[in-house]
Amino acid sequence: MFSPDDVKKYRDELGIKEHNDSTIKKDFFDFLEERDYSLSYKMPFMLAFINNINTIGDAEIDKVLDEYIKFYQDRIDRGLQVDRRTCPYNEKMLKDKKAICKNMLANPFEKFERKRFLYYSKDLSIISMNHALFSQMTKEDWKRIRTQMQEDLRNYYSEMGGV
């Protein structure tokens, strides 16, 4: 293994930022600001998650999943394009909660999990926000996330019939 001095040396040489509990909030908002949307999944997922998060940073996966599905089903019900052509979501698939849950956990959830912002407990059926991140969040931060996700959805769907 590397000594702490070696880690710092290589981190400096390679330009690798340190990621820890003191940087997690900035890391999270930097990640959101990247606006990396090959498909729309991150936006309705994050909105569903923050709409269902409780006072300790947990959200029941079934509630998140129901709201996530509702977003796409609403688009179908209104005769709007669900997403880009590569998106597998259609009327039939949206009725298969198990398939949608598997897809949601693979993408977009996994993108948040890989960076340690969110965790999933299959046994508890809970998606949790990293507690260091959750403890630093303010009302303004939640509003900022909601506003950005709604704006990003409007921009994303601007050429697909709107949100």
Regions found by a protein language model. Name each.
Residues M1-V163:
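Intrinsically disordered, charged low-complexity linkers and terminal tails
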